[in-house]
Amino acid sequence: MRKASVSRKTKETDIKLEFNLDGTGNSDINTSVGFLDHMFELLAFHGNFDIKLKAKGDIHVDYHHLIEDLGIVLGKAIDKTLLDRNGIKRYGFASIPMDEALAQVSIDIGGREFLIYNVKFDGYIKDIDISLFEEFFRAVSNHGKIALHINVLYGKDLHHIIEAVFKAFAKALSDASRIYGQQLPSTKGVI
């Protein structure tokens, strides 16, 4: 089983994550923010990952520190579970509709971090500025060593847009991390 435990404690956040890449979709999530709990539950379910997450942050200031640090911790956990990346499929893609919204995620978990985030919508879900999800996925990409392309083609309801992004990310990561053979997925011979 490809599992990792990652903790991060700063003056702003305290996060503990247990992540099983080869899970069954189980989750036990408590970030103290209902919408974030919902997104991580979707990530676990649609990626077939097991996620146990306890997090708290200085949300009395705003949500930036908590959301970015959750991305850091998730990225580190993904990187740890991929081990030497031998035998993985490496590339994944998903296109997910959520009612009127359509999100597409393409992913390369071959060890090179890069983020393209084409989510051209502004606003708030409750009191969370949705622009913070770009910081979340940037942290996942950087700390997970993932090239991550997120495109929202259209949508109106901000909840549906972000939910479609999380579901597409889950499906693409699940696909890319699947054991596909025994070789390192690179003609260079290294990742």
UniProtKB/Swiss-Prot annotation:
Major localization listed first in the record, in broad terms: cytoplasm
UniProt-listed HAMAP family: HisB (MF_00076)
Keyword Lyase belongs to the record: yes
Entry protein name: Imidazoleglycerol-phosphate dehydratase
Stretches assigned to coiled coil: none
Enzyme class: lyase
GO annotation, cellular component aspect: cytoplasm
Biological processes annotated in GO: L-histidine biosynthetic process
Keywords, comma-separated and alphabetical: Amino-acid biosynthesis, Cytoplasm, Histidine biosynthesis, Lyase
EC nos: 4.2.1.19
Gene that this polypeptide is encoded by: hisB
